[in-house]
């Protein structure tokens, strides 16, 4: 087990990670609101959770991880009423699409995916405890949390509530840091056909912030070691989670370490439907982009840094995967009988060094950029050793194993011996590429080129037309 340093948003600095039980690190991550397909900004946050999970396991920790499904909120109610469907009917296909997207980008399945609507009793229990402590008031049949009565409000977002007017409220789930007010815990129904529950705290449905506090309690019984989410959730969502959970259970630790992933930009701008730069994973795949390249790009920048998503960056990600895969394929050609059940026992000193440096990079607040530098340095050295025939079978097997070890985080490599394409298959792909170029579908054209290059096929434009040859 390797010691980890995480940047804790609560303290504003890197800290030694000290879970309650290293063999069962508890992690809660804010998941999708299932009213539409997740966009690629959401996907970056979900893949950050995947890298966190894979890193904890690689560094010797046991994990017990949860990502919630928000299946009741303002947007879901609005759209379900418009579609004349029940909440369950409306959210089911979007929930299914979320899991399909995770599979497409090779995200590992977590231990728990609770739905908000399955945790109503836990929400009611939290409200009742808050009522007993005088932290709740009623207005227009809805229940609100009085933030001025909670002493530690603002400790995560460092917000100052001293200038706030007493009793100013928000019914909406999302609002800006500059306009802090009391937030709603339990909403009375306002619209015809609005989903609601008859409970001991009244007829209504939960506010968004209450849902996560309740689901954490339902899954773990108390708090967690790590809570993650996008930086846009830090306020008000996570701040309000702290207020609810610590207000109801002041004797318990709610969250030890808060990790927040930064925004994703598209061509240097914030993603927006009005700007025409709003993409889902399915949009990108329809354009011919490789899911592996999408995954690689979304995990390749440190989670606390903004990531710019662009066509050039996707092409760069494809090239980087190809660089690693081509090295692996060279070794597999020499060692075709190697099995993919690796034990990761390394005896070569420089391979041991690569392993150690890779682990140390991840243990430093998931420094993926530094980890990737180790990967590419190892690929460079392995290629050099293969070029000069300076390795035997035993050594080559270790090279395969170290690349497999790296791929426990990357999740983009293929360890099966490469099957050569038939000439007819190559001709068919080249014809498809020509059609794509004619239609100005350059994303698909580039994807086919990358596919052929990965198979060692070079394409040449000549006066007589397109020719291809094997490298």
Swiss-Prot record:
The keyword Cytoplasm applies. Its EC number is 6.1.1.16. This is Cysteine--tRNA ligase. Keywords: Aminoacyl-tRNA synthetase, ATP-binding, Cytoplasm, Ligase, Metal-binding, Nucleotide-binding, Protein biosynthesis, Zinc. It is found in: Cytoplasm. GO terms for cellular component: cytoplasm; cytosol. GO terms for biological process: cysteinyl-tRNA aminoacylation. ATP binds at residue 273. A motif ('KMSKS' region) lies at residues 270-274. Zn(2+) binds at residues 30, 212, 237, 241. Its cofactor is Zn(2+). GO terms for molecular function: ATP binding; cysteine-tRNA ligase activity; zinc ion binding. Monomer. SUPFAM superfamilies: Anticodon-binding domain of a subclass of class I aminoacyl-tRNA synthetases, Nucleotidylyl transferase. HAMAP family: Cys_tRNA_synth (MF_00041). It catalyses: tRNA(Cys) + L-cysteine + ATP = L-cysteinyl-tRNA(Cys) + AMP + diphosphate. Belongs to the class-I aminoacyl-tRNA synthetase family. A motif ('HIGH' region) lies at residues 32-42. CDD domains: CysRS_core (cd00672). InterPro entries: Cys-tRNA-ligase, Cys-tRNA-synt_Ia_DALR, Cys-tRNA/MSH_ligase, CysS_C, Rossmann-like_a/b/a_fold, tRNA-synt_1_cat_dom, tRNAsynth_Ia_anticodon-bd. Binds 1 zinc ion per subunit.
């Amino acid at each position: 087990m390797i010691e980890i340093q995480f940047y804790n948003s609560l303290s504003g600095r890197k800290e030694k990670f000290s879970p309650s039980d290293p063999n069962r690190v508890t992690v809660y991550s804010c998941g999708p609101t299932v009213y539409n397909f997740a966009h690629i900004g959401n996907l970056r946050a979900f893949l950050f959770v995947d890298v966190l999970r894979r890193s904890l396991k690689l560094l010797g920790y046991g994990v017990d991880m949860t990502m919630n499904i928000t299946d009741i909120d303002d947007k879901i109610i609005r759209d379900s009423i418009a579609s004349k469907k029940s909440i369950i009917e409306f959210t089911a296909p979007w929930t299914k699409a979320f899991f399909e997207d995770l599979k497409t980008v090779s995200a590992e399945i977590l231990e728990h995916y609770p739905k908000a609507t399955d945790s109503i009793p836990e929400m009611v229990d939290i409200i009742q405890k808050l009522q007993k402590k005088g932290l709740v008031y009623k207005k227009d049949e809805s229940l609100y949390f009085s933030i001025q009565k909670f002493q530690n409000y603002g400790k995560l977002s460092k917000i100052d509530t001293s200038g706030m007017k007493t009793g100013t409220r928000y019914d909406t789930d999302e609002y800006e840091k500059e306009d802090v007010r009391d937030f709603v815990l339990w909403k009375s129904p306002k619209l015809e056909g609005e989903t609601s529950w008859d409970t001991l705290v009244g007829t209504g449905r939960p506010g968004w912030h209450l849902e996560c506090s309740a689901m954490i309690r339902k899954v773990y019984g108390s708090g967690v070691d790590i809570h993650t989410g996008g930086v846009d959730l830090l306020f008000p969502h996570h701040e309000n989670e702290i207020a609810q959970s610590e207000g109801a259970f002041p004797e318990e630790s709610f969250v030890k370490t808060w990790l927040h992933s930064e925004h994703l930009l598209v061509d240097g701008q914030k993603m927006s439907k009005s700007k025409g730069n709003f993409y889902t994973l399915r949009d990108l795949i329809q354009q011919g982009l490789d899911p592996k390249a999408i995954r690689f790009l979304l995990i390749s920048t440190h989670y606390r840094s903004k990531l710019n998503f662009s066509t050039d960056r996707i092409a760069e990600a494809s090239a980087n995967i190809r660089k690693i895969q081509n090295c692996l394929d060279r070794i597999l050609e020499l060692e075709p009988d190697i099995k993919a059940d690796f034990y990761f026992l390394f005896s070569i000193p420089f391979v041991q060094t690569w392993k150690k440096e890779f682990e140390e990079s991840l243990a430093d607040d998931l420094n993926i950029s530094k980890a990737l530098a180790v990967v590419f340095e190892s690929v460079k050295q392995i290629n050099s050793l293969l070029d000069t025939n300076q390795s035997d079978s035993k050594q080559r097997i270790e090279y395969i194993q170290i690349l497999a070890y790296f791929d426990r985080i990357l999740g983009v490599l293929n360890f099966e011996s490469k099957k050569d394409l038939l000439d007819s298959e190559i001709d068919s792909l080249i014809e498809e590429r020509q059609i794509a170029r004619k239609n100005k579908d350059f994303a698909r054209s580039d994807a086919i080129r990358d596919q052929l290059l990965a198979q060692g096929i070079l394409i040449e434009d000549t006066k007589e037309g397109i020719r291809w040859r094997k490298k």
